[in-house]
A protein has these predicted regions:
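Outer-membrane beta-barrel porins/channels
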Residues: 1, 67-281
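N-terminal, post-signal peptide beta-strand-biased segments of exported outer-membrane/organellar beta-barrel
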Residues: 1-82
Protein backbone atom coordinates (compact mmCIF):
# COMPACT_ATOMS: atom_id res chain seq x y z
CA UNK A 1 0.00 0.00 0.00
CA UNK A 2 2.97 2.31 0.47
CA UNK A 3 3.69 4.85 -2.28
CA UNK A 4 0.16 4.29 -3.68
CA UNK A 5 1.13 0.87 -5.02
CA UNK A 6 4.11 2.10 -7.02
CA UNK A 7 6.78 -0.60 -7.17
CA UNK A 8 7.54 -2.01 -10.62
CA UNK A 9 11.18 -0.88 -10.38
CA UNK A 10 11.58 -1.00 -6.58
CA UNK A 11 13.06 -3.77 -4.46
CA UNK A 12 14.36 -4.10 -0.93
CA UNK A 13 15.96 -6.88 1.06
CA UNK A 14 13.51 -6.44 3.96
CA UNK A 15 10.28 -5.36 2.29
CA UNK A 16 7.69 -7.24 0.26
CA UNK A 17 6.77 -5.92 -3.16
CA UNK A 18 4.40 -8.13 -5.15
CA UNK A 19 4.02 -5.45 -7.85
CA UNK A 20 7.02 -7.12 -9.50
CA UNK A 21 7.96 -10.73 -8.61
CA UNK A 22 11.56 -10.08 -9.66
CA UNK A 23 11.98 -8.12 -6.41
CA UNK A 24 11.83 -11.37 -4.39
CA UNK A 25 15.40 -12.16 -5.51
CA UNK A 26 16.76 -9.51 -3.12
CA UNK A 27 15.22 -10.88 0.08
CA UNK A 28 17.51 -10.91 3.11
CA UNK A 29 18.63 -14.39 4.20
CA UNK A 30 17.98 -13.56 7.87
CA UNK A 31 14.41 -12.30 7.49
CA UNK A 32 10.96 -13.85 7.19
CA UNK A 33 8.62 -11.09 6.07
CA UNK A 34 4.90 -10.95 6.80
CA UNK A 35 2.70 -8.06 5.69
CA UNK A 36 -1.01 -7.33 6.16
CA UNK A 37 -2.92 -4.39 4.71
CA UNK A 38 -6.24 -3.12 6.07
CA UNK A 39 -8.24 0.00 5.20
CA UNK A 40 -10.52 1.70 7.75
CA UNK A 41 -13.05 4.18 6.38
CA UNK A 42 -15.46 6.58 8.08
CA UNK A 43 -18.11 8.49 6.11
CA UNK A 44 -20.59 11.20 7.10
CA UNK A 45 -23.37 11.97 4.63
CA UNK A 46 -26.16 14.50 4.89
CA UNK A 47 -29.04 15.65 2.71
CA UNK A 48 -31.45 18.26 4.01
CA UNK A 49 -32.38 17.33 7.58
CA UNK A 50 -31.20 13.73 7.25
CA UNK A 51 -27.68 12.50 7.97
CA UNK A 52 -25.92 9.17 8.21
CA UNK A 53 -22.59 7.87 9.51
CA UNK A 54 -20.99 4.79 8.00
CA UNK A 55 -17.92 2.90 9.19
CA UNK A 56 -16.25 0.21 7.15
CA UNK A 57 -13.18 -2.00 7.38
CA UNK A 58 -11.69 -3.58 4.27
CA UNK A 59 -9.04 -6.28 3.99
CA UNK A 60 -6.44 -5.29 1.39
CA UNK A 61 -3.89 -8.07 1.31
CA UNK A 62 -1.88 -10.64 3.22
CA UNK A 63 1.60 -11.58 2.00
CA UNK A 64 4.72 -13.34 3.23
CA UNK A 65 8.17 -13.88 1.78
CA UNK A 66 11.58 -15.34 2.54
CA UNK A 67 14.83 -16.37 0.90
CA UNK A 68 15.09 -19.96 -0.38
CA UNK A 69 18.72 -19.85 -1.49
CA UNK A 70 21.31 -17.27 -2.52
CA UNK A 71 19.77 -15.11 -5.28
CA UNK A 72 16.42 -16.94 -4.99
CA UNK A 73 13.39 -15.62 -3.07
CA UNK A 74 9.83 -16.88 -2.56
CA UNK A 75 6.57 -15.11 -1.72
CA UNK A 76 2.94 -16.13 -1.26
CA UNK A 77 -0.21 -14.36 -0.25
CA UNK A 78 -3.89 -13.52 -0.59
CA UNK A 79 -5.35 -10.30 -1.96
CA UNK A 80 -8.66 -9.03 -3.35
CA UNK A 81 -8.71 -8.72 -7.13
CA UNK A 82 -11.92 -6.67 -7.18
CA UNK A 83 -14.70 -5.77 -4.74
CA UNK A 84 -18.28 -4.56 -5.06
CA UNK A 85 -20.41 -3.08 -2.30
CA UNK A 86 -23.19 -0.52 -2.72
CA UNK A 87 -26.83 0.12 -1.86
CA UNK A 88 -28.97 3.01 -3.03
CA UNK A 89 -32.60 3.77 -3.82
CA UNK A 90 -34.64 6.04 -6.05
CA UNK A 91 -38.28 7.06 -5.69
CA UNK A 92 -40.68 8.70 -8.13
CA UNK A 93 -44.40 9.53 -8.16
CA UNK A 94 -46.67 9.61 -11.20
CA UNK A 95 -50.35 10.56 -11.58
CA UNK A 96 -52.76 8.43 -13.57
CA UNK A 97 -55.77 10.67 -12.91
CA UNK A 98 -57.04 13.35 -10.52
CA UNK A 99 -56.81 13.15 -6.76
CA UNK A 100 -54.28 11.77 -4.30
CA UNK A 101 -55.58 8.21 -4.77
CA UNK A 102 -54.38 8.24 -8.37
CA UNK A 103 -50.75 8.79 -7.38
CA UNK A 104 -48.46 5.81 -7.95
CA UNK A 105 -45.15 5.78 -6.10
CA UNK A 106 -42.35 3.68 -7.55
CA UNK A 107 -39.34 2.76 -5.40
CA UNK A 108 -36.30 1.01 -6.85
CA UNK A 109 -33.48 -0.30 -4.67
CA UNK A 110 -30.11 -1.07 -6.26
CA UNK A 111 -27.62 -3.35 -4.51
CA UNK A 112 -24.26 -4.85 -5.38
CA UNK A 113 -22.08 -7.22 -3.40
CA UNK A 114 -19.24 -9.68 -3.75
CA UNK A 115 -15.86 -9.63 -5.41
CA UNK A 116 -12.97 -11.66 -6.74
CA UNK A 117 -10.08 -12.97 -4.65
CA UNK A 118 -6.61 -14.08 -5.64
CA UNK A 119 -4.15 -16.39 -3.92
CA UNK A 120 -0.65 -16.39 -5.38
CA UNK A 121 2.85 -17.84 -5.05
CA UNK A 122 5.93 -16.44 -6.75
CA UNK A 123 9.67 -16.82 -7.26
CA UNK A 124 12.35 -14.24 -7.93
CA UNK A 125 15.83 -15.15 -9.18
CA UNK A 126 18.97 -13.07 -9.80
CA UNK A 127 21.01 -14.73 -12.61
CA UNK A 128 23.41 -11.77 -12.91
CA UNK A 129 24.47 -9.03 -10.53
CA UNK A 130 21.93 -6.23 -10.83
CA UNK A 131 19.50 -8.25 -12.98
CA UNK A 132 16.60 -10.25 -11.53
CA UNK A 133 13.58 -12.01 -13.03
CA UNK A 134 10.46 -13.43 -11.43
CA UNK A 135 7.04 -14.98 -11.88
CA UNK A 136 3.78 -15.01 -9.90
CA UNK A 137 1.25 -17.81 -10.42
CA UNK A 138 -2.17 -17.41 -8.87
CA UNK A 139 -5.71 -18.71 -8.61
CA UNK A 140 -8.66 -16.33 -9.06
CA UNK A 141 -12.16 -16.99 -7.76
CA UNK A 142 -15.28 -15.25 -6.51
CA UNK A 143 -18.88 -14.19 -7.18
CA UNK A 144 -20.53 -10.81 -7.70
CA UNK A 145 -24.21 -9.88 -7.79
CA UNK A 146 -25.96 -6.70 -8.99
CA UNK A 147 -29.71 -6.36 -8.36
CA UNK A 148 -32.53 -3.89 -8.96
CA UNK A 149 -35.79 -4.40 -7.03
CA UNK A 150 -38.77 -2.21 -7.95
CA UNK A 151 -41.89 -1.89 -5.78
CA UNK A 152 -45.12 0.04 -6.38
CA UNK A 153 -47.42 1.72 -3.87
CA UNK A 154 -50.38 0.03 -5.57
CA UNK A 155 -50.55 -3.37 -3.85
CA UNK A 156 -52.19 -4.94 -6.91
CA UNK A 157 -49.10 -4.25 -9.03
CA UNK A 158 -46.42 -6.93 -8.92
CA UNK A 159 -42.89 -6.00 -7.92
CA UNK A 160 -40.08 -6.42 -10.44
CA UNK A 161 -36.66 -7.86 -9.74
CA UNK A 162 -33.75 -7.91 -12.16
CA UNK A 163 -30.51 -9.51 -11.05
CA UNK A 164 -27.17 -10.11 -12.71
CA UNK A 165 -24.73 -12.52 -11.09
CA UNK A 166 -21.43 -13.95 -12.23
CA UNK A 167 -18.99 -16.47 -10.85
CA UNK A 168 -15.35 -16.74 -11.91
CA UNK A 169 -12.57 -19.23 -11.29
CA UNK A 170 -9.31 -19.35 -13.22
CA UNK A 171 -5.56 -18.93 -13.04
CA UNK A 172 -3.36 -15.83 -13.30
CA UNK A 173 0.23 -15.61 -14.50
CA UNK A 174 2.48 -12.55 -14.17
CA UNK A 175 6.13 -12.07 -15.12
CA UNK A 176 8.62 -9.40 -14.13
CA UNK A 177 12.21 -8.24 -14.48
CA UNK A 178 14.32 -5.61 -12.72
CA UNK A 179 17.70 -4.08 -13.39
CA UNK A 180 19.51 -1.94 -10.80
CA UNK A 181 22.81 -0.08 -10.95
CA UNK A 182 24.66 1.97 -8.35
CA UNK A 183 25.75 5.27 -9.93
CA UNK A 184 27.35 6.74 -6.80
CA UNK A 185 28.15 5.64 -3.27
CA UNK A 186 24.64 6.37 -2.01
CA UNK A 187 22.63 6.51 -5.22
CA UNK A 188 21.05 3.60 -7.06
CA UNK A 189 18.78 3.73 -10.12
CA UNK A 190 16.57 0.89 -11.28
CA UNK A 191 14.34 -0.12 -14.17
CA UNK A 192 11.49 -2.63 -14.01
CA UNK A 193 9.05 -4.26 -16.43
CA UNK A 194 6.04 -6.51 -15.78
CA UNK A 195 3.71 -8.51 -18.00
CA UNK A 196 0.38 -10.06 -17.03
CA UNK A 197 -0.98 -12.80 -19.25
CA UNK A 198 -4.41 -12.15 -20.80
CA UNK A 199 -6.70 -15.17 -21.22
CA UNK A 200 -10.26 -16.45 -20.95
CA UNK A 201 -11.78 -17.12 -17.53
CA UNK A 202 -13.79 -20.15 -16.47
CA UNK A 203 -17.13 -19.36 -14.89
CA UNK A 204 -20.74 -18.44 -15.56
CA UNK A 205 -23.02 -15.42 -15.75
CA UNK A 206 -26.77 -15.40 -15.11
CA UNK A 207 -29.46 -12.78 -15.68
CA UNK A 208 -32.84 -12.96 -13.88
CA UNK A 209 -35.94 -10.96 -14.81
CA UNK A 210 -38.81 -11.74 -12.41
CA UNK A 211 -42.28 -10.55 -11.39
CA UNK A 212 -42.93 -10.99 -7.66
CA UNK A 213 -46.20 -10.94 -5.72
CA UNK A 214 -45.68 -10.94 -1.97
CA UNK A 215 -42.69 -13.23 -1.53
CA UNK A 216 -43.50 -15.57 -4.41
CA UNK A 217 -42.10 -15.39 -7.93
CA UNK A 218 -45.07 -15.26 -10.32
CA UNK A 219 -43.15 -15.35 -13.59
CA UNK A 220 -39.69 -14.72 -14.90
CA UNK A 221 -36.88 -15.51 -17.26
CA UNK A 222 -33.40 -16.81 -16.52
CA UNK A 223 -30.58 -16.68 -19.04
CA UNK A 224 -27.23 -18.33 -18.31
CA UNK A 225 -23.94 -18.00 -20.19
CA UNK A 226 -20.70 -19.88 -19.61
CA UNK A 227 -17.05 -18.85 -19.98
CA UNK A 228 -17.84 -15.36 -21.32
CA UNK A 229 -15.25 -13.33 -19.40
CA UNK A 230 -11.59 -12.77 -20.15
CA UNK A 231 -8.69 -10.91 -18.58
CA UNK A 232 -6.76 -8.36 -20.65
CA UNK A 233 -3.02 -8.58 -20.97
CA UNK A 234 -1.15 -6.07 -18.83
CA UNK A 235 2.16 -4.37 -19.55
CA UNK A 236 3.95 -2.08 -17.11
CA UNK A 237 7.27 -0.25 -16.85
CA UNK A 238 8.79 1.58 -13.92
CA UNK A 239 11.73 3.74 -12.91
CA UNK A 240 13.18 3.93 -9.42
CA UNK A 241 15.78 5.86 -7.44
CA UNK A 242 17.15 4.90 -4.03
CA UNK A 243 19.23 7.20 -1.85
CA UNK A 244 21.14 5.32 0.87
CA UNK A 245 18.05 3.19 1.69
CA UNK A 246 16.54 6.34 3.24
CA UNK A 247 14.64 7.87 0.35
CA UNK A 248 12.97 6.07 -2.54
CA UNK A 249 11.22 7.56 -5.54
CA UNK A 250 9.29 5.57 -8.12
CA UNK A 251 7.40 6.16 -11.33
CA UNK A 252 5.15 3.50 -12.90
CA UNK A 253 3.18 3.29 -16.12
CA UNK A 254 0.73 0.41 -16.65
CA UNK A 255 -1.37 -0.43 -19.71
CA UNK A 256 -4.29 -2.86 -19.51
CA UNK A 257 -5.97 -3.69 -22.82
CA UNK A 258 -9.57 -3.92 -21.64
CA UNK A 259 -10.74 -3.19 -25.18
CA UNK A 260 -9.72 -6.72 -26.16
CA UNK A 261 -11.39 -8.37 -23.14
CA UNK A 262 -14.88 -9.91 -23.22
CA UNK A 263 -17.78 -9.66 -20.78
CA UNK A 264 -21.61 -9.64 -21.01
CA UNK A 265 -24.18 -7.17 -22.29
CA UNK A 266 -27.97 -6.77 -22.07
CA UNK A 267 -29.04 -5.54 -25.50
CA UNK A 268 -32.48 -4.09 -26.30
CA UNK A 269 -33.64 -4.93 -29.83
CA UNK A 270 -35.82 -2.83 -32.12
CA UNK A 271 -38.99 -4.73 -31.15
CA UNK A 272 -38.38 -4.01 -27.46
CA UNK A 273 -37.16 -7.50 -26.57
CA UNK A 274 -33.86 -7.96 -24.76
CA UNK A 275 -30.95 -10.31 -25.37
CA UNK A 276 -28.32 -11.25 -22.77
CA UNK A 277 -25.15 -12.15 -24.63
CA UNK A 278 -21.37 -12.26 -24.67
CA UNK A 279 -19.89 -8.94 -25.76
CA UNK A 280 -16.58 -7.29 -26.50
CA UNK A 281 -15.72 -4.23 -24.41
Amino acid sequence: KGMAGTGIALSDSRRLNFANPASYARFDSLSFMFDVGVTLQAEHRSAGNASRNDYRAQFDYLAAGFRLAPRLGFSFGLRPFSSVGYELATQSTSLSGSGASSALTTTTRYTGEGGLHQVYAGLGFMPLNGLSVGVNAGYLWGTTTHSAYTQFSNSSTDALRRSYAYEVRSYTLDFGAQWARRIARRHEVSLGVVYGLGHGLHGSAEFYNQRISGSAVQSGDTVALRNVFSLPQTVGVGLGWNYANRLRLGLDYTLQQWGSATSTALETLADGSQVFRKADN
